[in-house]
């Protein structure tokens, strides 16, 4: 019997003195000349590894299961069966505890019935908790925050958008923790109300101040900006109080409603707008969550049709 070109190692004694020893059940048998033991060298681990490579490409990439079938040579039926097995074996959720955890919280709608609420450690850039709810309301978020308490995390701050439900829930469960408003959300919402080209001097001046929000980095910047906002209000207080009567309905509405709404939005957010200046470890925006949601929805569009459990 001929020696192997690519020499195998005996699994029993480790010898490389191996010879072919016939065929059984369509598998090549080998015999060790050193210890006399015979064995069949199968490679199930390679097959399993290959399957997982295709699974990763499907889950994390942009290929559909039809694309994977065409590239890999496996049938769609086999791929679905293998992938379902992997999906049923969800990875173990491990939380890394450390001092001064700064949490980003936000929600997004995956469809009309499922709202994903995500809690992310800003320092570790890791999701520490998530939940699905029928609506992004105060009670659902309180339930999540109570679950966070059981993890015994040392939470130092929360950063969120202007959702009243999130703000009330955090205030209820963590009344003494710093709450930072996302300055990007504040700026974006205010600019949407003021439009790109305001028609009044009040709107033009306020828009200029709004565009400075995300560039405020120091205590001096903060104090100077707040001073300008107060001066703006002193100058235009009567202007934003003006009302117009609808001739058809007789209803009175604010004449410059968008300018007024922008100022009120800033005024309400102001107590929690600049926590990050006193503590630079506190993130001042939830951009990383917005980016994560964007990638997640891109993947969900590729995998549309999967069951809710998966």
Segments (PLM) and residue ranges:
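Short, surface-exposed beta-strand-loop junctions and turns on beta-sheet-rich folds
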Residues: 38, 124-125, 302
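Short metal-coordination and nucleic-acid-contact micro-motifs, chiefly zinc-binding Cys/His arrays
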Residues: 3-9, 25-28
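Acidic/histidine-rich catalytic cores and adjacent linkers
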Residues: 29, 41-43, 51, 157-167, ...
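Short, positively charged, Gly/Tyr-enriched micro-motifs
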Residues: 14, 19, 24-103, 107-114, ...
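Conserved beta-strand -> loop -> alpha-helix junction used to position metal-binding or nucleic-acid-contacting
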Residues: 158-164, 169-207
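RNase H-like nuclease fold core
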Residues: 72-164, 168-176, 269, 288
């Amino acid at each position: 019997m001929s020696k192997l070109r690519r020499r195998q190692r005996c699994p029993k004694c480790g010898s490389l003195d191996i010879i072919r020893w016939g065929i059984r059940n369509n598998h090549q048998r080998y015999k060790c000349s050193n210890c006399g033991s015979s064995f069949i060298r199968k490679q199930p681990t390679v097959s399993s590894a290959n399957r997982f490579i295709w699974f990763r490409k499907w889950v994390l990439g942009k290929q559909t299961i039809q694309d994977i079938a065409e590239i890999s040579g496996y049938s769609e039926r086999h791929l679905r069966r293998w992938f379902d097995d992997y999906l049923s074996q969800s990875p173990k959720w491990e939380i890394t505890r450390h001092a001064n955890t700064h949490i980003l919280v936000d929600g997004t709608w995956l469809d009309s019935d499922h709202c994903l609420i995500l809690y992310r450690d800003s320092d570790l850039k890791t999701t520490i908790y998530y939940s699905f709810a029928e609506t992004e309301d105060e009670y659902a978020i309180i339930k999540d925050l109570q679950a966070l308490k059981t993890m015994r995390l040392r939470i130092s701050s929360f950063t969120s958008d202007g959702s009243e439900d999130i703000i009330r829930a955090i205030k209820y469960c963590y009344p003494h923790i710093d709450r930072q408003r996302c300055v990007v959300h504040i700026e974006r919402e205010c600019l949407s109300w003021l439009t790109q080209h305001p028609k009044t001097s009040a709107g033009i001046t306020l828009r200029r101040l709004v565009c400075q929000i995300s560039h405020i980095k120091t205590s001096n910047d903060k104090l100077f900006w707040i001073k300008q906002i107060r001066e703006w209000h002193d100058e235009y207080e009567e202007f934003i109080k003006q009302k117009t009567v609808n001739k058809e309905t007789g209803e009175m509405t604010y004449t410059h409603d968008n300018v007024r709404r922008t100022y009120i939005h800033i005024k309400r957010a102001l107590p929690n707008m600049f926590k990050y200046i006193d503590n630079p470890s506190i993130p001042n925006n939830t951009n990383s969550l917005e980016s994560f949601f964007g990638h997640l929805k891109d993947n969900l569009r590729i995998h549309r049709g999967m069951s809710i459990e998966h």
